[in-house]
Regions:
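Long, contiguous C-terminal flanking segments immediately downstream of a protein's structured core
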Residues: 2-6, 14, 20-22, 78, ...
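Short acidic, glycine-rich loop/turn motifs
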Residues: 27-31, 57-59, 476-480, 552
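Basic/aromatic-rich interaction segments and small domains that mediate binding to polyanionic partners
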Residues: 28-30, 41-79
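Short secondary-structure capping/turn segments at boundaries of alpha-helices and beta-strands
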Residues: 39-43, 140-143
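Short beta-strand segments
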Residues: 35-38, 72, 485-487
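Short coil-to-beta transition motif at edge beta-strands of beta-rich domains
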Residues: 14-36
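Short, solvent-exposed loop/turn segments that connect beta-strands within catalytic domains
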Residues: 31-33, 46-49, 480-483, 524
Length: 553
């Protein structure tokens, strides 16, 4: 071995002592934002001088898969998530105490001077200059934050935290922290997380998103913390078999956020995929947004969690919602999802009305999100808000908007009329099968039983229906018409939207083919467009005293 080779070997050994395989590191080059990764190789690369570190980057933005010139040096998660860098371009992190002191005490020790990053531009005629902004009360806030002993909420995102630091130091300096955000840091494993939790006796909420932790079931499970009630592990590349171990790590967890992971099923790693999820007895909120769930039968494996009140499934790949218990006592504690109050299903692939009808069977459901599904698409979908409200009788909130009693009543009446209008020639059995709540709504709103005749809808009284007049107010906001007063007009319930356009043409001289009509409901913040010329005023739920808005295309 030559002298140069001996020197390289010594340097390589020193580098290996400083950088261990699996260690979390961050790039000191921040031009592209924070870059985190795991060390997969430390040593010499054939054909290149010096010591190199092979890093598998979390972002996937590397140069190769660990193979250079036909030689594999390390394995990567992605096809091009690996690259070689020099050791001096990497940071191995700081202790939690150092990060806290650097952020909070440093800010409180600054002089009361304008913030360099906050300014406004002057309005001078010759040239603009930067006028510094001084925040009123900023010094007081920073002074209070600088008192680490009373700090309750600490945010250390991408601060390079890799360890708790010497035992007892954090507890002495910042014992009151209740919420800690460690998103995008360099903690290597759950043992280090446990040390942090042990140092912070008041800690209840912990954000660990954008981390990479090994999960391994041990003979004696690691108790990370019995005090933590809320944990976020968003964008950590987790599968459910890893998450399932958390019930041993965090026995009293109530809120668990797992957004943007790799969860496609609820197989726990020990049992077959056919079993229900066990444990997690205290879990109330589970956020699984932006994962890879496709089969509703997988979601049903969560249905025995006794305390689960809110389940977020936005941005998955679900095509159908089902509920197994369609009969019996809805108050039974043995029913699936017995405690579930909120279910968010936005941005999925739900396209069938049976999914909406299934939601009506959930025993406690009050809040549902169905936006951005094929069924509810405002251009191609068939589900409007009034239909969704009518088909789910227990809801008090839909797509983030409260359902007031007036809106529910009007939606249900409008829905019944819509069914009567569109299914005149259908049998009673066919209608009830397609619209499970129709008969119940008919009774709630006191529609006469003689609407059925020989198993079909009785239209014998359609003439009296057509002659049922009421007054509506038409407001014209079309720019081409100019300013004009609103007009109140008496119209029969059987007036179609197409005929209403003819009426508006005679009143405001705006051709019907250039009109766009809206129905203004006091319980809806946004006017509802009247698109179907064949629908009647009764079908769309327009009654006495309502307002029609006329605009131009």
């Amino acid at each position: 071995m030559t002298g140069g080779e001996v020197a390289d070997a010594r340097v390589c050994e020193i580098a290996r002592q400083q950088l261990k395989l699996g260690q979390r590191v961050s790039s000191l080059n921040t031009e592209k934002g924070p870059q985190l990764g795991s060390v997969k190789f430390v040593g010499i690369v054939n054909g290149f001088k010096g010591i190199w570190v092979g890093v598998d980057w979390d972002s996937g933005q590397g140069r190769h898969n660990g193979v250079v010139d036909g030689v594999r040096y390390f394995d990567t998660v992605g096809e091009k998530s690996g690259s070689f860098v020099r050791p001096h371009t990497l940071s191995t992190g700081v202790s939690l105490l150092d990060a806290l002191t650097s952020k909070y005490r440093a800010s409180s020790n600054r002089k009361d001077e304008p913030d360099e990053e906050m300014y406004v531009l002057s309005t001078g005629k010759k040239r603009q200059t930067k006028v510094p902004v001084l925040l009123v009360g900023k010094k007081q806030v920073e002074d209070r934050q600088g008192q680490l002993g009373i700090l309750r909420l600490a945010a250390l995102t991408y601060a390079g935290v890799c360890c708790a630091g010497p035992a007892g130091h954090i507890r002495d300096v910042a014992p009151s922290i209740e919420e800690l955000d460690l998103t995008g840091n360099l903690l290597p494993d759950w043992h280090e997380v446990k040390r942090i939790c042990d140092e912070l006796p008041a800690l209840r909420i912990l954000e660990l998103s954008c981390s990479r932790f090994p999960f391994a079931a041990a003979a004696k499970p690691l108790l990370v913390s019995s005090n933590l009630t809320g944990v976020a592990l968003n964008h950590c590349g987790l599968t459910w078999s890893q998450v399932d171990i958390l019930k041993h790590y965090l026995p009293n967890i109530q809120d668990l956020s797992l957004i943007g992971n790799c969860i496609s099923n609820f197989k726990d790693g020990n049992e077959d995929a056919g079993g229900f999820v066990q444990g997690l007895q205290t879990l109330r909120l589970l956020n699984l947004d932006d994962n890879y769930l496709e089969d509703w039968q997988e979601v049903m494996k969560l249905s025995k969690l006794p305390s689960l009140a809110k389940l977020c499934l936005n941005g998955n790949r679900l095509t159908l919602v089902e509920y197994l218990a369609r009969s019996g006592d809805r108050n039974s504690t043995s029913l699936p999802f017995v405690s579930l109050l909120c279910l968010y299903l936005g941005r999925n692939n739900l396209a069938d009305w049976s999914s909406v009808d299934a939601l009506d069977w959930f025993p406690s459901l009050q809040d549902v999100r169905l936006s951005d599904n094929p069924l509810t698409d405002h251009k191609t979908g068939t589900a409007t808000r009034f239909m969704l409200i009518a088909r789910m009788g227990s809801l008090s909130c839909l797509n983030g908007s409260l359902i007031k009693p007036r809106e529910r009543r009007d939606s249900e009446i409008r829905y019944v009329r819509h069914v009567l209008q569109t299914m005149r020639t259908q049998s009673k059995e066919r209608i009830i099968k397609s619209h499970p709540r129709f008969e119940k709504l008919r009774m709630i709103h006191d529609l006469p039983e003689d609407i059925w005749s020989s198993g079909y809808i009785n239209t014998a009284n359609s003439d009296s229906f057509a002659n049922n007049f009421f007054a509506v107010t038409i407001e014209c906001v079309a720019a081409g018409v100019g300013e004009c007063a609103s007009i109140t007009k008496k119209l029969p319930l059987a007036t179609t939207i197409g005929k209403l356009k003819v009426v508006c043409e005679s009143l405001f001289k705006l051709p019907s083919n250039q009109q766009r009509l809206y129905f203004k409901d006091q319980d809806s913040p946004i006017p509802i467009e009247l698109k179907d010329d064949l629908e009647t005023l009764a079908d769309v739920g327009i009654g006495p005293g309502r307002i029609i808005i006329l605009d131009e295309i």
